[in-house]
A protein has these predicted regions:
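Conserved AMP-binding/adenylate-forming
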Residues: 1-78, 84-87
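Short glycine-biased active-site loop of nucleotidyltransferases that positions the nucleotide triphosphate
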Residues: 12, 123-126, 185
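A short, local hydrophobic-aromatic micro-motif
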Residues: 19, 34, 45, 112, ...
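AMP-binding/adenylate-forming catalytic core of the ANL superfamily
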Residues: 40, 45-46, 69-164
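Conserved C-terminal "lid"/linker of ANL adenylate-forming enzymes
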Residues: 113-118, 158-198
């Protein structure tokens, strides 16, 4: 779809669209972010003998809707910001991209793995709590003299929240004792995570 060239690169971008590739952003928000849709000779024609599945992923103009979220800047550089299926849409219409918050949290010392999601509560009046579930590097934290892992990460996340807009702030930190379940590509399987908060 796109690539950075040896002498033509932009930090954070996956590059300019390759020759003969058309890229558009479907239903962009106020920041220009939306679903990345592509059209070109390298795009599949559809799913074999499955017109319904094909119709689900192609729009009326023949663009393939990738399921990736991103934006194009004024010069046509493409940025990927997350996955559509991971997107958290709050009741006020604001979009929260978990991958953006996960990237910030992953830079905290002692974080081995992290997943951010919208917590599910049966009792809380505010059901829009953003949860950061962390699998820590327990050995590293132990060598750093951290006795209370929960308190350590609660403090780190509070500090991070001070730099975040209010609707993106993490409201709960969950610590897990084992790695997240992964698929054969070593990617975390998000749907297997218990998102309950009470």
């Amino acid at each position: 779809v796109s690539c950075n060239r040896n002498k033509l690169q932009k930090k954070g971008s996956v590059g300019l669209p390759i020759m003969h590739e058309q890229v558009k952003i479907k239903d962009p928000n106020e920041d220009g972010e939306g679903e990345i849709c592509i059209k070109g000779p390298n795009v599949m024609l559809g799913y074999y003998n499955d017109p319904e599945a094909t119709a689900e992923v192609f729009d009326d103009e023949g663009y393939f809707c990738t399921g990736d979220l991103g934006k194009l800047d004024s010069e046509g550089w493409l940025y990927i910001t997350g996955r559509l299926k991971n997107l958290i849409i709050l009741s006020n219409g604001k979009n929260v991209y978990p991958e953006e918050i996960e990237l910030k949290i992953s830079k905290i010392r002692g974080v081995e793995e992290v997943v951010v999601y919208q917590g599910e509560s049966r009792s809380a009046s505010d059901k829009e709590i953003i949860v950061a579930e962390i699998y820590p590097n327990f050995e590293m934290l132990k060598s750093d003299g951290v006795d209370d892992v929960q308190a350590y990460f609660d403090r780190q996340i509070r500090e991070m929240n001070e730099e975040m807009v209010s609707y993106k702030k993490v409201g709960m930190v969950k610590i897990r004792d084992e790695e997240f379940a992964k698929n054969t590509s070593k990617k975390i399987v998000r749907f297997k995570i218990d998102k309950s908060v009470d």
